[in-house]
């Protein structure tokens, strides 16, 4: 997902410049839906032949790149654990696409972006490469994080710059709005807080309103 921020997500070139007519990212279905698709013996350890067939028999990303990315959260010992981590990855996968577009909306960011079409929202057949909801109409974490990223007034975090930006999709301006960033450690102790007052232009963005400084020992 960090490749979306760097704009290196595709060897075909830029994916978040101008108007993008087709963009998408997979999300692993929930473990209950995976169990509807295949026998338990093919779920874990992952049977690559079966998973690749259920990946559209073309991209084969779920048994390769997606699995490698899920393992960044630590090696899994069961399909239940793997599927749960897969939801985390799917969430940030979709969130990063929308928030990068937010940041670069029109003339406000590092590069001009006038829009993108997300392909696709649902699955037309049982697939391990699900989207916002799957063949059984079961929503994934991608749906909720997409909805969050596209709320009309949205504060968002840039994972590469450690900055917070605020997006306004309303056709009216908002003045003297306060954005607050807080960081908590693993024990839910607040270790950082900073705020900034922003004037949001109509259908515009205030980028890098504040910078989060993460404590070294967090």
Question: Can you name each region flagged by the protein language model?
Answer:
Residues 3-175:
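Substrate-binding clefts and catalytic carboxylate motifs of secreted carbohydrate-active enzymes
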């Amino acid at each position: 997902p960090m490749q979306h921020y760097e704009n290196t997500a595709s060897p075909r070139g830029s994916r978040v410049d101008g108007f993008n007519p087709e963009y998408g990212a997979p999300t692993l279905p929930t473990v209950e839906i995976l169990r509807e698709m295949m026998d338990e013996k093919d779920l874990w350890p992952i049977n690559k032949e079966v998973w690749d067939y259920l990946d559209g028999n073309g991209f084969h990303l779920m048994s390769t790149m997606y699995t490698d990315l899920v393992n960044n959260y630590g090696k899994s010992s069961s399909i239940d654990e793997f599927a749960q981590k897969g939801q985390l990855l799917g969430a940030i996968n979709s969130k990063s696409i929308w928030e990068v577009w937010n940041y670069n909306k029109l003339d406000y960011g590092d590069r001009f972006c006038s829009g993108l079409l997300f392909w696709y929202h649902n699955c037309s057949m049982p697939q391990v490469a699900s989207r916002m909801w799957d063949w059984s109409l079961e929503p994934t974490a991608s749906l909720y994080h997409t909805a969050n990223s596209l709320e009309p007034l949205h504060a968002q975090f840039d994972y590469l710059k450690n900055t917070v930006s605020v997006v306004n999709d309303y056709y009216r301006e908002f003045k003297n709005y306060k954005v607050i960033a807080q960081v908590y450690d693993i024990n839910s102790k607040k270790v950082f807080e900073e705020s900034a007052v922003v004037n949001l232009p109509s259908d515009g963005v205030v980028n890098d309103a504040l910078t989060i400084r993460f404590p070294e020992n967090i």
